[in-house]
């Protein structure tokens, strides 16, 4: 037995129907497309969302909301993630160095989620009341 002699068992595979190859095939002449009309032509599709000329649902519904530009440069950091920072000072640059936030982030808020056992000094970041209490309870401090 060689790789070039391998073949599926006889009768295990069915050849696909070949469209438009004579009336005896069952899919000759119109090839299963019926007669006339847009869908019988080549390239005869309608774009996604087209409803036959009726005002589409996407256009019938009102627009709402917007994307805040500040949210693109803001991030929340959990207390548990502060342990990943090497050193005892946590600021914007140290968070970026530890890959906790991306390089485009300009504003960070530390939130109470998870536990902190490490003594850290948080510099120049906003901190929630609960997170502040947890950091101070662990022996850390917050500097503006």
Swiss-Prot record:
Protein name: Large ribosomal subunit protein uL15
Gene Ontology process terms (BP): translation
Gene responsible for this protein: rplO
MF term (GO), any: rRNA binding
Alphabetized PROSITE patterns for the sequence: RIBOSOMAL_L15
Protein task: Binds to the 23S rRNA.
Quaternary assembly: Part of the 50S ribosomal subunit.
Keywords noted in UniProt: Ribonucleoprotein, Ribosomal protein, RNA-binding, rRNA-binding
Transmembrane stretches, start-end: none
Alphabetical list of PANTHER family matching this protein: 50S RIBOSOMAL PROTEIN L15, LARGE RIBOSOMAL SUBUNIT PROTEIN UL15M
């Amino acid at each position: 037995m060689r790789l070039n002699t391998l073949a599926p068992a006889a009768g295990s595979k069915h050849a696909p129907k070949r469209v438009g190859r004579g009336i005896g095939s069952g899919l000759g002449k119109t090839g299963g497309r019926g007669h006339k009309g847009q869908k019988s032509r080549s390239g005869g599709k309608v774009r996604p969302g087209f409803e036959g000329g009726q005002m589409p649902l996407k256009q019938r519904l009102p627009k709402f909301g917007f994307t805040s530009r500040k949210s693109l440069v803001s991030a929340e950091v959990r207390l548990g993630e502060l342990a990943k920072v090497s050193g005892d000072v946590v600021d914007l640059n140290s968070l970026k160095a530890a890959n906790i936030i991306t390089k485009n982030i300009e504003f960070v808020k530390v939130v109470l989620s998870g536990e902190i056992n490490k003594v850290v000094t948080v510099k120049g970041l906003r901190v929630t009341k609960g997170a502040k209490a947890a950091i101070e309870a662990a022996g850390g401090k917050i500097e503006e």
